[in-house]
């Protein structure tokens, strides 16, 4: 749909979270036109991610309601605000929950992808000018992670958009907006896995499976996939896992099982769940002297991690990774190209597709462990 004459607001179908722990409601909201430095996009597809469910549960310390969730999408630019030069109407884009302005201290450092240009307001569910572009029956609706892909139309900061190849399949590349990029990037950018290294992946959701795929790309020697749901093992092996372990099959902690495989531990471990107890096991199963454990999963508000200091004194390293260390505007377009060439597999992640009206079913499938990613289409 093209908007030939831009009015001050347009109508948009959206799945709105009016309160925590309640089903999303499909309603027609008002979306204002983009202001300076902003872009109006029409989302064509969006994945449903565990992070959306985490916020909906009420456990997210930055969760605000009512809100349009969704942060793993792909769409087309409809209109641009004053000063926007990097995209134009008709361009195909992926919204970014991790912006890249290129000008803040973090971007200029070259050491991180954690741009802070819009971070403060984004964490409050607002646009950079501290207002919202969404409303319903005259009441403001908050944005989410700077993306809000559960609305057909959304307004996003220019610095939070990656321009991509218009030939890309949106049903698949939308997953590069979060889960797949997070997992693959953590392997290459955060852990820097080398050929022949051993890898253990705790949790085989989309992110964990993406870690497995990234480890295979890095030519890791042994890739151990760990999950309590053995139904995920077939796909893990398809992505490159050499071993699949179910902790419920053992009468001892999975950490000890891994130390039986190698008494000194695993070169790189990845926690992809958000469970602080698993985070400890992942660290303590890392190789003595040089092993590193990468925390990707997001734990609930107020939860803390712990271990004996001796685990770190003896050479293990604990690291965190956000969006796989990937710089969205400058690096994500190449990942889209890689997926189009088959170097990144995306299709196997999409286990279900459905229209927006059925989005609550997508959350049910996720909670029941019956899906890897459900993609919503508009």
UniProtKB/Swiss-Prot annotation:
Required co-factors: Zn(2+)
Subunit-level organization: Homodimer.
A Pfam family the protein falls into: ADH_zinc_N
**What terms describe the molecular function in GO for this protein?**
alcohol dehydrogenase (NAD+) activity; S-(hydroxymethyl)glutathione dehydrogenase (NAD+) activity; S-(hydroxymethyl)glutathione dehydrogenase (NADP+) activity; S-(hydroxymethyl)glutathione dehydrogenase [NAD(P)+] activity; S-nitrosoglutathione reductase (NADH) activity; zinc ion binding
Q: Which organism is it from?
A: Haemophilus influenzae (strain ATCC 51907 / DSM 11121 / KW20 / Rd)
Enzyme Commission number: 1.1.1.284, 1.1.1.1, 1.1.1.-
Which InterPro entries has this protein been placed in? ADH-like_C (IPR013149), ADH-like_N (IPR013154), ADH_3 (IPR014183), ADH_Zn_CS (IPR002328), GroES-like_sf (IPR011032), NAD(P)-bd_dom_sf (IPR036291), PKS_ER (IPR020843)
Q: What does this protein do?
A: Has high formaldehyde dehydrogenase activity in the presence of glutathione and catalyzes the oxidation of normal alcohols in a reaction that is not GSH-dependent. In addition, hemithiolacetals other than those formed from GSH, including omega-thiol fatty acids, also are substrates. Also acts as a S-nitroso-glutathione reductase by catalyzing the NADH-dependent reduction of S-nitrosoglutathione.
What catalytic activity is recorded? S-(hydroxymethyl)glutathione + NADP(+) = S-formylglutathione + NADPH + H(+); S-(hydroxymethyl)glutathione + NAD(+) = S-formylglutathione + NADH + H(+); a primary alcohol + NAD(+) = an aldehyde + NADH + H(+); a secondary alcohol + NAD(+) = a ketone + NADH + H(+)
Protein name from the UniProt record = S-(hydroxymethyl)glutathione dehydrogenase
List UniProt keywords, sorted A-Z.
Cytoplasm, Metal-binding, NAD, Oxidoreductase, Zinc
The terms describing its cellular component in GO are: cytosol
GO biological process annotation, one example: formaldehyde catabolic process
As to how many cofactors bind and how, the note says: Binds 2 Zn(2+) ions per subunit.
- The residues listed in the UniProt record as binding Zn(2+) 1, with positions renumbered to this chain, are 49, 71, 178
Family assignment from sequence similarity: Belongs to the zinc-containing alcohol dehydrogenase family. Class-III subfamily.
Q: Where in the cell is it found?
A: Cytoplasm
Which Gene3D superfamilies does the protein's record reference? Answer: Medium-chain alcohol dehydrogenases, catalytic domain (3.90.180.10), NAD(P)-binding Rossmann-like Domain (3.40.50.720)
Record-listed Zn(2+) 2 binding positions: 101, 104, 107, 115
């Amino acid at each position: 749909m093209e908007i030939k004459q831009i009015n001050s607001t347009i109508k948009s179908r959206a799945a709105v979270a009016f309160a925590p722990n309640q089903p999303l409601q499909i309603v027609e909201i008002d979306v204002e036109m983009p202001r300076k430095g902003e872009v109006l996009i029409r989302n064509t597809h969006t994945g449903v991610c565990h992070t959306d469910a985490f916020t909906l549960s009420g456990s997210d310390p930055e969760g605000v309601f009512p809100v349009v969730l969704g942060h793993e999408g792909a769409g087309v630019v409809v209109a641009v605000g004053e000063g926007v030069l990097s995209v134009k109407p008709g361009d195909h884009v992926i919204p970014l929950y991790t912006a890249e302005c290129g000008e803040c201290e973090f971007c200029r450092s070259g050491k991180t992808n954690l741009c802070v240009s819009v971070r403060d307001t984004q964490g409050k569910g607002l646009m950079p000018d501290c207002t919202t572009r969404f409303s319903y029956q005259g009441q403001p609706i908050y944005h989410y992670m700077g993306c809000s892909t559960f609305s057909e139309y959304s307004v996003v900061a220019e610095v939070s958009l990656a321009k991509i190849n218009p030939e890309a399949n949106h049903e698949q590349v939308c997953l590069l907006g979060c889960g797949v990029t997070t997992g693959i990037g953590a392997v290459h950018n955060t852990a820097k896995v080398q050929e022949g290294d051993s890898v253990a992946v705790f949790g085989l959701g989309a992110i964990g499976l993406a870690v497995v795929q990234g480890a295979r790309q890095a030519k890791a020697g042994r890739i151990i996939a760990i999950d309590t749901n053995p139904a995920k093992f077939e796909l893990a092996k398809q992505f490159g896992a050499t071993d699949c372990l179910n902790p419920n099959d053992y009468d001892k902690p999975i950490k000890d099982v891994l130390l039986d495989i190698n008494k000194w531990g695993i070169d790189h471990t990845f926690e992809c769940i958000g469970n602080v107890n698993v985070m400890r096991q992942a660290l303590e199963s890392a190789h003595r002297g040089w092993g590193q454990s990468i925390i990707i999963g997001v734990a609930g508000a107020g939860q803390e991690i712990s271990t004996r200091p001796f685990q770190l004194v003896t050479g293990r390293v604990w690291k965190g990774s956000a969006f796989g260390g990937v710089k969205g505007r400058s690096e994500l377009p190449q990942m889209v190209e890689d997926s189009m060439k088959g170097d990144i597999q995306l299709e196997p992640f999409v286990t279900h597709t459905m229209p927006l009206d059925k989005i609550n079913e997508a959350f049910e499938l996720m909670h029941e462990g019956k899906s890897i990613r459900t993609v919503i289409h508009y």
